[in-house]
From Swiss-Prot:
Family affiliation: Belongs to the universal ribosomal protein uS13 family.
Protein name: Small ribosomal subunit protein uS13
Subunit (UniProt): Part of the 30S ribosomal subunit. Forms a loose heterodimer with protein S19. Forms two bridges to the 50S subunit in the 70S ribosome.
Encoding gene per record: rpsM
Organism of derivation: Streptococcus agalactiae serotype V (strain ATCC BAA-611 / 2603 V/R)
Keywords on record: Ribonucleoprotein, Ribosomal protein, RNA-binding, rRNA-binding, tRNA-binding
Function: Located at the top of the head of the 30S subunit, it contacts several helices of the 16S rRNA. In the 70S ribosome it contacts the 23S rRNA (bridge B1a) and protein L5 of the 50S subunit (bridge B1b), connecting the 2 subunits; these bridges are implicated in subunit movement. Contacts the tRNAs in the A and P-sites.
Basic residues compositional bias, start-end: 106-121
GO BP, sorted A to Z: translation
Length: 121
């Protein structure tokens, strides 16, 4: 298994798919990395030469991934909460942030439904 950005990527998959195991690298970013490194998308990870692995590592190091990216996202959310913006308030209350309705749905954000005593007829 090749190790890129602190993540073991699978050997038997194509490189373009294996790179998506790194947090912050999706399919389009993976394709851009391979194009910049001059490596075919169809090659398997186990068939990569050490030089090709190093080229991929150099390209990935230029992108914010894994811990740095997670930290930045968390700091952005924390900043929104501190300045008291609408989005920050929604984060603090555990409600949907992007304008979704909450009358009937939003169970994922709100958690399990809590029964109200004395509601039966």
């Amino acid at each position: 298994m090749a190790r890129i950005a602190g993540v073991d990527i699978p050997n038997d998959k194509r490189v373009v798919i294996s790179l998506t195991y790194v947090y912050g690298i999706g399919l389009s970013t993976s394709k851009k990395i391979l194009a910049a490194a001059g490596i075919s998308e169809d090659i398997r990870v186990k068939d990569l030469t050490p030089d090709q692995e190093d080229a991929i590592r150099r390209e990935v190091d230029a992108i914010k991934v894994e811990g740095d990216l997670r930290r930045e996202v968390n700091l952005n959310i924390k900043r929104l909460m501190e300045i008291g913006s609408y989005r920050g308030i929604r984060h603090r209350r555990g409600l949907p942030v992007r304008g979704q309705n909450t009358k009937n749905n939003a169970r994922t954000r709100k958690g399990k439904a809590v029964a109200i005593a004395g509601k039966k007829k």
